[in-house]
Regions:
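Compositionally biased, low-structure terminal segments
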Residues: 3, 92-94, 110
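Short, solvent-exposed loop/turn segments at secondary-structure junctions
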Residues: 72-74, 201-202
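Alpha-helical interaction segments
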Residues: 7-8, 88, 99, 191
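Intrinsic disorder/low-complexity segments
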Residues: 80-106
């Protein structure tokens, strides 16, 4: 289950970081996070929105949603619901995961991003970090449509070599990364893009 106590980080009186998940289900060759923090655990959706509402009442206007792979938010909630008849009661047990369609019994990260941006008093919403292989069009849609969501995408590339990316176990090619960035820029022409590059792997 998700920890009941989390560290609170404030960059300033107007900004706060909100942890939406812990752990990671990826197996990147250079990263020890899965070994030390375990599998991904998503924080309940309603709990997250409630925290942002409370922060807004305290005067916070800028939120950064934080996770090792924010785009996989809610995936574990789906696994908990698998094989269970989805009802209001069962949904509450896993943090209000709901059925948007027959194959998506969970809130997507884009749903959470939109809900946080709609909280009264919140003026800017950022997030970090997404994984290129899990970046969904719905997330870019929200960034393009919702003015409170900042038009900044930090998308770690790690390497421009497909051979190195394969050795890193990243799950995408350089061309696939470029395709995702191009699709994002098609919707958000002024998109600010930042990345991470590892030099000298391994």
């Amino acid at each position: 289950s998700f920890p009941s106590a989390l560290p609170v980080k404030r960059d300033a009186n107007h900004a706060a970081w909100v942890t939406i998940q812990i752990g990671c289900d990826n197996s990147c060759a250079f990263c020890i996070v899965p070994s030390v923090r375990g599998r991904e655990i998503s924080r309940p959706y309603r709990e997250l929105v409630n925290e942002v509402e409370q922060l807004a009442m305290e005067g916070i206007t800028e939120i950064t949603l934080l996770g090792q792979n924010v785009n996989s938010y809610g995936r574990d909630l789906t696994l908990k619901l698998r094989g269970t008849e989805v009802s209001a009661e069962s949904s509450q047990l896993v943090g209000e995961a709901w059925v948007r369609g027959p194959h998506t019994p969970r809130p997507l990260f884009s749903d959470l991003l939109r809900s946080v941006a709609e909280v009264s008093g919140i003026r800017r919403v950022r997030y970090t970090s997404p994984h290129p292989k899990d970046l969904r069009p719905e997330t870019i849609d929200v960034m393009a449509q919702v003015p409170e969501v900042c038009e900044h995408l930090h998308l770690p590339l790690q390497s421009g070599s497909d051979e190195v990316l394969s050795a890193m176990h990243r799950g995408y090619t350089a061309d696939r990364y470029v395709e995702k960035v191009a699709a994002a820029r098609q919707q958000i022409p002024d998109l600010a893009l930042s990345t991470d590059i590892i030099v000298g792997f391994p």
